From Swiss-Prot:
Keywords, alphabetical: DNA replication, Early protein, Host-virus interaction
Pfam families: T7-like_gp12
Keyword Thylakoid applies: no
Designated name of the protein: Inhibitor of dGTPase
Job description of the protein: Plays a role in increasing the intracellular pool of dGTP. Interacts with and inhibits host dGTPase/dgt. The complex made of the host dGTPase and gene 1.2 protein creates a GTP-binding site of high affinity. Subsequent binding of GTP to the enzyme-inhibitor complex inhibits its dissociation.
Length: 85
């Protein structure tokens, strides 16, 4: 496993910040699955009251690809939720 490219991490942070501006929280859990030899990230989006909006789990052996997958999902969720009241 190599080092995470800083541009991918910056894009991930920018995607989470867009959701924070909508008063939503992004909860991030990560672990390594030794059986499948993949890094795993579970993302949950909740409102400030703790009500679950959506959740998704991502698996990949490459951290850059994993963070790109998470960033794409967060941006997609932002596009869906920005007009939601």
């Amino acid at each position: 496993m190599g080092r995470l490219y800083s541009g991918n991490l910056a894009a991930f942070k920018a995607a989470t910040n867009k959701l924070f501006q909508l008063d939503l929280a992004v909860i991030y859990d990560d672990w390594y699955d030794a059986y499948t030899r993949k890094d795993c990230i579970r993302l949950r989006i909740e409102d400030r009251s703790g009500n679950l909006i959506d959740t998704s789990t991502f698996y990949h052996h490459d951290e850059d690809v994993l963070f790109n997958m998470c960033t794409d999902w967060l941006n997609h969720m932002y596009d869906q939720l920005k007009d939601w009241k």
